[in-house]
A protein has these predicted regions:
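Helix-coil-helix junctions within alpha-helical repeat/solenoid scaffolds
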Residues: 5-203
Length: 203
């Protein structure tokens, strides 16, 4: 997966798609980490402007039956993104279930789901529905709290990319420029970051 991210930044999209199809996507696996990695790579490809074809639908089919699992907020938001990518009604069902779990759950994950999972899932769903302003409004307040949700820095970086792209698309110029400048300071050699910085300051 990390090798695919390196190829992605190099712009070798055909190789990344081939690696996804041949190595990363496992039709037999329902392992949550596999599904999260699949969703993350597909979304990153789209952020790079790559058409991923029908690949979202294959991942979404595995997520549809897991809208009430709530193992980790980190997993739920990836499932929400995947279901929203194909405009599946289960995206809304997952959000409603997640909201209820955040209120009523009695394990350690419930308050994290309420604080971070619920607004982040709402933001990702809004993003996939093309409501970029709403995506920004949901995601900005929780952007610094994401480490509580789990996952590695590389895994969580997807949400920073989506927020920056949403801010640009929503015409939130000041926010987009601030996010882009902050990101460029952290990763000046990253091709997507440089391109997003150019987009933000051209708006």
């Amino acid at each position: 997966w990390h090798r695919a991210l390196m190829r992605l930044d190099e712009g070798d999209y055909d190789t990344v798609l081939a690696e996804y199809d041949q190595s990363l996507w496992d039709p037999k696996s329902d392992e949550y980490l596999d599904l999260c990695n699949d969703a993350s790579l597909l979304m990153r490809l789209e952020l790079h402007g790559v058409d991923v074809g029908g690949r979202w639908a294959d991942v979404a089919e595995k997520c549809k039956a897991r809208t009430n699992d709530h193992l980790l907020a980190f997993i739920d938001v990836h499932f929400a993104l995947t279901l929203a990518a194909i405009d599946a009604p289960e995206a809304g069902e997952l959000y409603a279930s997640l909201a209820k779990y955040g209120e009523d759950g009695n394990d350690d994950n419930a308050p994290i789901s309420a604080e971070i999972g619920k607004p982040l899932a709402a933001g990702l769903i809004a993003y996939k529905q093309g409501d970029f302003g709403a995506a920004v409004d949901y995601m900005v307040p929780v952007r610094y709290a994401l480490p509580k949700m789990g996952g590695s820095n590389a895994q969580r970086d997807l949400f920073a990319m989506i927020l920056l792209d949403a801010a640009i698309r929503a015409g939130r110029a000041n926010l987009a420029r601030a996010l882009a400048a902050e990101r460029l300071g952290r990763m000046p050699e990253n091709a997507w970051t440089r391109a997003a910085h150019t987009r933000a300051f051209a708006a």
